[in-house]
C-alpha cells in the first residue's frame, strides 16, 4: 500500500478515464480526495505485488486491473466495538460513487488508533452493516 500525490494522482485519473471511461472527478473538481492510498498487486492468483510507474499514464493503463484504491478512516473513540460496531463513519459522496464504480477495486480500511485494530471492507460490507445513512454534499463556490 502506498500513497500517491500530485501528478501521480492526475495520471491515475487520466488512465481510468482513457481505458475504462471512469471519471475520478466531479465537474471541475480535480483534487481526487476520494481515496488515500493505492494497493498494487495481482488480483488473480498468485496474488503478488506489482510495480507500477505512476509517472506514466501508459504503465498505469496497462496495470489498472491490479490497482485497488483505498480510503482510510480512523478513530480513537473508546465506545467503538472491536469490529467497529457503533462507529459513525464519515463517507463522502465521491468516495461512495467511486467505490460503486470500481466494485472490488475500492476498499475502506478502518483503523482504531487506540487499539491498533484494522479491518478492510468493501462498500457492500459497509452498507450491509449500516444502521443509518445520511448523504450530504459540501460545495465550495468559486
Region spans (language model):
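Acidic-basic catalytic patches of nuclease active cores, encompassing PD-(D/E)XK
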Residues: 1-33
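A structural signal for short secondary-structure junctions
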Residues: 30-31, 62-65, 100-104
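Conserved catalytic cores of phosphodiester-cleaving nucleases, focusing on short active-site segments
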Residues: 36-39, 48, 66-78
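Short mixed-charge
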Residues: 37, 43-63
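A short acidic (Asp/Glu
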Residues: 49, 81-83, 120
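Residues immediately flanking
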Residues: 72-74, 93, 113
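Mg2+/Mn2+-dependent nuclease catalytic core
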Residues: 76-101
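Domain-level recognition of nuclease-like catalytic cores that cleave nucleotide substrates
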Residues: 97-142
Amino acid at each position: 500500500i502506498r500513497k500517491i500525490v500530485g501528478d501521480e494522482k492526475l495520471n491515475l485519473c487520466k488512465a481510468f478515464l482513457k481505458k475504462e471511461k471512469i471519471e475520478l472527478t466531479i465537474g471541475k473538481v480535480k483534487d481526487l480526495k476520494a481515496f488515500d492510498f493505492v494497493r498494487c498487486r495481482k488480483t488473480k492468483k498468485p496474488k503478488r505485488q506489482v510495480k507500477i510507474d505512476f509517472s506514466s499514464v501508459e504503465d498505469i493503463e496497462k496495470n489498472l486491473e491490479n490497482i485497488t484504491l483505498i480510503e482510510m478512516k480512523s478513530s480513537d473513540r473508546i465506545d467503538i466495538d472491536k469490529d467497529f460496531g457503533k462507529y459513525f463513519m464519515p463517507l463522502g459522496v465521491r468516495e461512495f460513487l467511486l467505490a460503486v464504480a470500481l466494485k472490488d477495486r475500492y476498499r475502506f480500511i478502518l483503523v482504531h488508533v487506540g487499539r491498533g485494530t484494522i479491518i478492510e471492507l468493501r462498500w457492500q460490507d459497509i452498507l450491509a452493516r449500516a444502521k443509518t445513512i445520511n448523504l450530504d454534499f459540501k460545495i465550495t463556490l468559486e
